[in-house]
Amino acid sequence: MKNVIVLIFICYTFNFVAFADTGFFFYVQFADKNNTPFSLDNPSEYLSQRAIERRMFFGVAVDSTDLPVNPEYVSTVKNVGVKIVGKSRWLNGVTILAQDSNIMQNIRNLPFVTKTQYTGRRTTQQYVSKINKTINEDSLSYGNSETQIKQIKVNALHNLGYRAKGVQMAVIDGGFLNANTNPAFDSLRFHNRLLGAKDFTDSNPNVYANENHGANVLSIMTGNLPNKYLGIAPDASYWLLKSEYSTNEYLVETDFWVSAIEFADSAGVDMANSSLGYRTFDDPSMNFTYNDMNGQVSRASIAAEMAAQKGLIVCVSAGNDGTGSWHYIASPADAKGIVTVGSVMANGNPSSFSSYGPTADGRVKPELCAMGSSTAYVSTSGTPTIGNGTSYSSPVMAGALACFLQYAKENFTTFSVEQLLSAVFESGNTYLSPQPQTGYGIPDFQLAMSNLNNRLSDISKTSHKNHVFYNSENQTLYIDKDIIGNENITLYSVLGRVIFNKKLTTKQISLKQYNLPSNIYILRIGNTTQKVIVY
């Protein structure tokens, strides 16, 4: 990154032949989703089964924001003479590339368009040599990732067998140079835990070329070099999503980020990590101000909050402006409901470069800190090394949370993301006195396990579930009388459609009126879920 946020202190030297203007990016806002061919009754048309199951687990209903943008609107805009680069179902708009900015008046005149925004210029970048990289650390001081893992006591999870197995993570970043050949990712590829890679920048579809930032971040989570290096979440599965446009810095990158996080949601990932941030751009008229850092201005921040609302755990780097004139976190680190991660040194002191909170509206940011000074990672050549930046503390935290998520899923019938994160926040060494640079501080995941156990012990998998019985003859649910009047009850189809949502006031609920076909349904009572077989 250049003028946005350099989230890792590495010096890059790029040698380019030329830059050639090839168009203008715009964001186009639609008024509605009227007459869409998609339906809330059939979310499998636009969400993966895993995405639907995640919503059901956390009690999140499929709603209108999940519906894709109206394809007729998209087609009409395209036929004006522009290229559709990205679509946002959550924000109900599209990112376009126009060769002639004068054509935009025709788009503004369309009856379903409420506004357009210029977001940057597209250039073609030609490389004549590889990236020349120097790092402000001479050599690795400890040979593996032990220090950064033990600092937050994730080894306690590892020792119990929780290494993020079954957890899917999206890494939203720049390029992933050599991730398809790097020996540090041999086990990732061999065990088919590399789920796929996508470019959202409409530039180079080969995400394994040119840029190494994303690959470095990935190695912190899943790098594996026997006796040399072990990532913090080595058994998780990963999507590699490129949203960073390397040739320049424009507002359009926030829209690329939105496309990436929406894809991650629809693919059904459990978590996302992004070591990117946005505040200033090549065109100063696009710059954010600190007052914009309230979670409601940047489209990336709005989308990050929406991802959290849909059950994703989202980790974002705080930024490296602690000693700079900007000083504060940037977008999307200002989003509500996500985990913004600052940096500390091995001794626990804050890294001087780590950006400060709070948000412009006074919320604690960053929430947590992990080791971002002299953090161990694996280079694109497959050699363990170290570097600095909140780009590196964020994947440390994301990987730790992935292990913690596996622990929670294997020990409790149900829980919320809020309960999970609260257990971690409360384990922070400054939880009772949040600090502007470190938030709740350095978490202790051994303590977080205890916190979660205390919180959820009443719904442990060793405890009984709600007593529910389905009588197929009269199509009636019979429910334990002890919980009548105390909880809400929701019945979902396996596709995530809400069949009913009501206050539980009687121990008998007739399903006749719903004409349910024989299938498996998900019943949620309060904070617990269980399957109901209708036949």
Predicted regions and their residues:
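C-terminal outer-membrane/trafficking sorting elements
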Residues: S460-Y535
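Hydrolase catalytic cores
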Residues: L218-M221, L241-Y245, Y328, G372-T438
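Substrate-binding/access-modulating region of protease and related hydrolase catalytic domains
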Residues: H158, R163-A164, N224-N227, L240-D334, ...
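Primarily auto-inhibitory N-terminal propeptides
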Residues: F19-V85, N102-Q105, P111-Q125
